[in-house]
């Protein structure tokens, strides 16, 4: 990775959702195990859980029911599930609310995620909805990450150039989408990803952005 670029031009901060804004492993485990149990299949393996953390619900069910005669029925079932019982298992990542509050209004804030219909429920449940100017879920694009469509939509909305945006993610699909969109990639709690910056805590972002005053830190 080349030297980190100047951040003086940045005006849009884009976040992934699962694993970055929220800790959703417990919720996702319960959700997909519920579907598997419905069709008499064993619970998620660790490798399957790693996959579903970063995929759309449709891709997750396709993988879990690969070769199964119930795959289409399972897809219909996952689309019909009421997500609300699983929301209680979600946890916001540490200091995310404080970081978002400090970023605004100096920066626009947005979400680009492969999470689908549950995204508005998640943001409302955790009190994060008012802290974002724009959200793009898998339901808002025709091609999900690692395709950059979600990021390109955000750039278009804010009339921003790629050099004026950064994307904070925790997975290889986030890195690939950033590269293809041309935006600066910041890795969250994943030192294995090639990134301009690595964060272990969301408050660390405030230390590298020039338009956040010391009073906000």
Go through each PLM region and give its residues.
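Asp-based, Mg2+/Mn2+-dependent phosphohydrolase catalytic module
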Residues: 1-11, 101, 116, 120-217
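N-terminal helical cap/lid subdomain that shapes the substrate entry/recognition surface
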Residues: 3-101, 105
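Short glycine- and Lys/Arg-enriched binding-loop motifs that mark or flank ligand-binding interfaces
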Residues: 15, 109, 165
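Secondary-structure boundary/capping positions in well-ordered alpha/beta enzyme cores
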Residues: 42, 67-68, 106-107, 129-130, ...
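Short beta-strand/loop segments at the ligand-binding rim of alpha/beta enzyme cores
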Residues: 108-109, 184
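Conserved phosphate-coupling serine/threonine residues in phosphotransfer and NTP-handling enzymes
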Residues: 113
């Amino acid at each position: 990775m080349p030297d980190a670029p100047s951040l003086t031009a940045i005006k849009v901060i884009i976040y992934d959702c699962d694993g970055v804004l929220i800790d959703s492993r417990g919720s996702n485990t319960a959700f997909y195990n519920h579907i598997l149990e419905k069709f008499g299949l064993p619970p998620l393996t660790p490798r399957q859980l790693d996959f579903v953390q970063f995929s759309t619900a449709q891709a997750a069910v396709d993988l879990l029911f690969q070769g199964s005669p119930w795959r289409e029925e399972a897809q219909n079932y996952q689309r019909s599930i009421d997500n609300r019982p699983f929301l209680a298992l979600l946890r916001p990542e540490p200091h995310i609310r404080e970081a978002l509050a400090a970023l605004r209004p100096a920066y626009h804030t947005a979400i680009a995620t492969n999470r689908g219909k549950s995204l508005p429920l998640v943001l409302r449940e955790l009190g994060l909805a008012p802290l974002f100017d724009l959200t793009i879920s898998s339901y808002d694009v025709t091609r999900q990450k690692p395709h950059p469509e979600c990021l390109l939509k955000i750039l278009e909305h804010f009339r921003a150039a790629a050099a004026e945006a950064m994307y904070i993610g925790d997975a290889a699909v986030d890195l690939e989408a950033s590269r293809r969109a041309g935006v600066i990639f910041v890795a969250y709690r994943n030192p294995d990803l090639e990134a301009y910056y690595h964060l272990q805590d969301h408050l660390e972002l405030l230390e590298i952005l020039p338009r956040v005053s010391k009073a906000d830190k």
